[in-house]
């Protein structure tokens, strides 16, 4: 990052009236740095323009950052506190919630206390990493462990689950890593909204093609796909020469119903929101 033509004066402004005080510019525009304090040899920093001057001691300053820490992994309580921001349908309008790498405790909370309470959004979930990335039991047990994880979750038409994680390039850290597929599942729904409508299925070869995949943590075969789909888990499959595809469009609703399909649940969410909005203007007429 480079920021030019800045000032040490707190009231300094550019020709268009925006602040060029270096502290404000760094804190508002930098993606990596938060200003803490003036360096020792910066004369009159933080004063007004009339108080600021230059002397021979004001030399370019170079500072190296060291001793940082990535901190501790967030706890379930902290994550729940963050997700609870979406709990009120009146305050926050949201259609899709990403479960990221949620464990069973967090996934149940999102389903029961956010999506089932709001009834106007869907959460996208993935298996736990230990079940599908270098399976902690033994290779070949991925489908069984994924189904076991799904069976710890409640039945809900407001939740969707895929079958694996994907291996992709992380451009921000210049490494390859596994990431849960629920972000891609949500992305397919958004792309379907853009190209068609929410009541079209986001799965299949026409609308379910997943991008930016080096490989899948597990590529289920037909027998495994049948078991996963029966449990309400949507398999993600790489077909040679045809790409990687979301090969199912079920919700986590356990009982047979039209609402065990993603597109049906999303159709009714759209209808209910539209009816609610329209009825506001006739409520007291």
Model segments located where?
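Extended, beta-strand-rich, solvent-exposed assembly scaffolds of outer structural proteins
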Residues: 1-15
């Amino acid at each position: 990052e480079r920021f030019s033509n800045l000032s040490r004066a707190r009231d300094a402004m550019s020709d268009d009236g925006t602040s060029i005080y270096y502290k404000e510019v760094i804190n508002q525009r930098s993606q990596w740095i938060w200003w803490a304090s003036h360096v020792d040899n910066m004369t009159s920093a933080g004063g007004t323009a009339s108080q600021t001057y230059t002397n021979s001691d004001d030399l370019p300053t170079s500072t190296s950052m060291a001793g940082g820490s990535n901190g501790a992994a967030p706890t379930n309580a902290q994550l729940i506190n963050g997700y609870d921001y979406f709990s009120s349908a009146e305050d926050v309008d949201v259609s899709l919630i990403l479960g990221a790498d949620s464990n069973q405790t967090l996934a149940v909370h999102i389903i029961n206390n956010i999506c089932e309470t709001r009834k106007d959004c869907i959460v996208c979930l993935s298996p736990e990493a230990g079940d599908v990335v270098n399976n902690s039991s033994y290779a070949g047990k991925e489908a069984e462990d994924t189904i076991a994880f799904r069976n710890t979750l409640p039945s809900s038409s407001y939740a969707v689950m895929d079958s694996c994680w994907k291996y992709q390039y992380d451009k921000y850290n210049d490494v390859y890593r596994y990431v849960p597929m629920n972000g891609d599942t949500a992305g397919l729904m958004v792309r379907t909204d853009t190209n068609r409508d929410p009541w079209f299925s986001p799965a299949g070869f026409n609308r379910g093609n997943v991008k930016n995949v080096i490989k899948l943590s597990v590529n289920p075969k037909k027998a495994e796909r049948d078991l996963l789909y029966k449990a309400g888990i949507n398999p993600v499959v790489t077909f040679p020469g045809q790409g990687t595809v979301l090969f199912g469009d079920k919700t986590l609703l356990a009982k047979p119903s039209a609402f065990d399909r993603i597109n049906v649940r999303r159709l009714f969410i759209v209808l209910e929101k539209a009816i609610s909005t329209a009825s506001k203007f006739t409520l007291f007429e």
